[in-house]
Amino acid sequence: MTIIRKKHPLIKIINHSFIDLPAPSNISSWWNFGSLLGLCLIIQILTGLFLAMHYTSDTSTAFSSVTHICRDVNYGWLIRYMHANGASMFFICLFLHVGRGMYYGSYNMIETWNMGIILLFAVMATAFMGYVLPWGQMSFWGATVITNLLSAIPYIGTTLVEWIWGGFSVDKATLTRFFAFHFILPFIITALVFVHLLFLHETGSNNPTGLNSDADKIPFHPYYTIKDFLGVLILLMGLMILVLFFPDVLGDPDNYTPANPLNTPAHIKPEWYFLFAYAILRSIPNKLGGVLALILSILILALLPLLHTSKQRGLTFRPITQTMYWILVADLLILTWIGGQPVEYPFIIIGQMASIAYFAIIVIFMPMAGMIENNILDLD
């Protein structure tokens, strides 16, 4: 078995990636989320495949086909809710994974980090298009509002929006193409995940101290396979509690009403995992400015390696920057809350203050804190 594992051209790739991979001896449970994201992706592809067998991407039958899946298909309700709530678990793991990278300075592995940002954009695009497919009220109006933002692009905006719609409004052509893209993107994401891992294995994993761990490595299997397996059990337990007891808690009741272009919902809002970006978008009165802020709210992650001023890699021994980091986390929670609120006083001003704080903490306060800590510790 050892000979096959180390000599077979295909199996040796798996061996070098998941079995004999040298890993730091001190990585904590915060390093579990990579494997959990892989599990989420597998769950989403499998459940999505079975949903696609019964779904029809036509405006007249899309809503009915989802109802048919839940009522008539064997365990269709389970597959549908696993897919819907699996997306939420995916984003929880994604945010924690990115947060871990920010906390421990993993963004200094620039290729891996940039690949991760591309993956984040791809997953967000996939989730957005998936939300349109059930063709409920929030599906239709969410698609209308978000795609319409592209009309803010000077000169080509309106033409671009109509090209994406396949007509003069969100309609049959839009739904069909969104289904096609929603189906193909997870496979593209899978390919990008392998590139992400390829870049990661060029440098090796970071660790909580932020120091070079070449002198103290242990094999990935069995130590981290068993540790990952515990994470898998916790994730699956959380997902199944959500699916079996609270399947609609993260959804929007409006999406149980079939799409009606003549009736606008009182509050149009995306799924909870986009609310922070949606709040930033709404905080700027100018349409183009809002769209740029929306894109920058994610793209700003690419600037983190340039904004790193500290002589230390992670925040483990940096109390001032730690404080800034946790204020940023609280700020993101406030933005998520604001994104789900109506556009009225006092939510408008809270959203604007939280949006300014979000960019200010990342661009100004965290780099300043890094320099102050260098000074205090005489690391200049």
Curated annotation (Swiss-Prot):
This is Cytochrome b. It is a multi-pass membrane protein. Binds 2 heme b groups non-covalently. A ubiquinone binds at H201. Its cofactor is heme b. The keyword Acetylation does not apply. The cytochrome bc1 complex contains 11 subunits: 3 respiratory subunits (MT-CYB, CYC1 and UQCRFS1), 2 core proteins (UQCRC1 and UQCRC2) and 6 low-molecular weight proteins (UQCRH/QCR6, UQCRB/QCR7, UQCRQ/QCR8, UQCR10/QCR9, UQCR11/QCR10 and a cleavage product of UQCRFS1). This cytochrome bc1 complex then forms a dimer. The gene is MT-CYB. CDD domains: cytochrome_b_C (cd00290), Cytochrome_b_N (cd00284).
